[in-house]
Amino acid sequence: MQKEIAIPLAYFITFTCYGTWLHGGKITSVDKQHNIPGTEFVLADANREASAKKRLVEAPYLLDHAQRHIVLDAIKEACTFRAWILLAAHIRTNHIHLVVHATVSPESIMNTIKSYASRRLNESKLDSNRLKRWTRHGSTRYLWKEEDVEVTIQYVIHEQGDPMAIFENKSRESFAGAVIAP
């Protein structure tokens, strides 16, 4: 007998640009000891942050206006090609937020998105000498309830400061159909 695997309504995926969001810095972060929703983040620690900075192999990576739009287009391309439903995306200067419905793992989505974005950035020749653009992993949250999906989309689109490169799927019909399909 085959075991049914529960698929969440969507995933909330966040990843940062290389060297911009270091453990111990003033910006909150998670690590292996601080990764349970609702618990404390990594505390600010100047020594830990300085140690992380020393380990960087190149300068921190920031996305300018043109690069953010290249990344957004690459994300839409990847989602279309893989038949994933992109519900929301916000490409910031130093991090990316996505809300995606898919039947694969959020880690697979994140890795694919990073690959597509890097490929398109390489083709643009805006920063082709970079070795590293993205942090090694990121945050992957499972959204099981419609309310959680809507709240997360609101956060991604409207609660990040001034809009940068954004996408919001206004049509939830395609999403609803995908959710109830076997």
Where are these regions (language model features)?
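Short catalytic/metal-binding and nucleic-acid-binding patches
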Residues: 1-182
